Amino acid sequence: MKRIVVGITGASGTIYAVDLLEKLHQRPDVEVHLVMSAWAKKNLELETDYSLAQLTALADATYRANDQGAAIASGSFLNDGMVIVPASMKTVAGIAYGFGDNLISRAADVTIKEQRKLVIVPRETPLSVIHLENLTKLAKLGAQIIPPIPAFYNHPQSIQDLVNHQTMKILDAFHIHNETDRRWEGD
């Protein structure tokens, strides 16, 4: 059984988190631990038709963003890694500098110190030098940066097709077999 921590921040792009949680929920071999920031909850309302109750029902465990005593705040909580989707630049900066002022950044800090898989899905454009330096710092620490950049070789016909490709990339990072989207097979 894989155990994945999912952090959702207030950056736009909550649809990526919703899709990931839907696909993880379909897998009996994956346990999901979810934490959302206050702005993530607001964006869920603004950007999707999901209610908070519907979204949290997709997770096996949920935590409050200010609960620094939560299981996922400790290195002794064994898991296969964490994904932050979407990741705000505030959260990226906090993680890059070890500023664990909320449960998302604390859980990411623990993920780094325990040398577990950390996937960051940054949602910002354009990126400033500060953003790029913070993302580079995290990549040097072992985080995998997977920005939501669509592929077009698969001829997407809808926003959902674009989201599916991103979810495939995230699941691949955790070695979770999936056929969420069509893969490149050569020309």
From Swiss-Prot:
Catalytic activity: dimethylallyl phosphate + FMNH2 = prenylated FMNH2 + phosphate
Record-linked Pfam families: Flavoprotein
Protein keywords: Flavoprotein, FMN, Prenyltransferase, Transferase
InterPro entries, alphabetized: Flavin_trans-like (IPR036551), Flavoprotein (IPR003382), UbiX-like (IPR004507)
EC nos: 2.5.1.129
Keyword Cell division recorded: no
Recorded superkingdom: Bacteria
Gene Ontology molecular function: any one: flavin prenyltransferase activity
Disruption phenotype: Cells lacking this gene are unable to decarboxylate gallic acid and protocatechuic acid.
Binding site for dimethylallyl phosphate: Y153, K169
Binding of FMN, residues: G10, A11, S12, S37, S88, M89, K90, T91, R123
Alphabetized PANTHER family for the sequence: FLAVIN PRENYLTRANSFERASE, FLAVIN PRENYLTRANSFERASE PAD1, MITOCHONDRIAL
Note: Gallate decarboxylase does not form a complex composed of Lpdc, LpdB and LpdD. The term subunit has been used in reference to the three-gene operon. Gallate decarboxylase LpdC is the only protein required to yield the gallate decarboxylase activity.
Record-stated family: Belongs to the UbiX/PAD1 family.
Its biological purpose: Involved in tannin degradation. Flavin prenyltransferase that catalyzes the synthesis of the prenylated FMN cofactor (prenyl-FMN) for gallate decarboxylase LpdC. The prenyltransferase is metal-independent and links a dimethylallyl moiety from dimethylallyl monophosphate (DMAP) to the flavin N5 and C6 atoms of FMN.
Protein name: Flavin prenyltransferase LpdB
Species of origin: Lactiplantibacillus plantarum (strain ATCC BAA-793 / NCIMB 8826 / WCFS1) (Lactobacillus plantarum)
Name of the encoding gene: lpdB
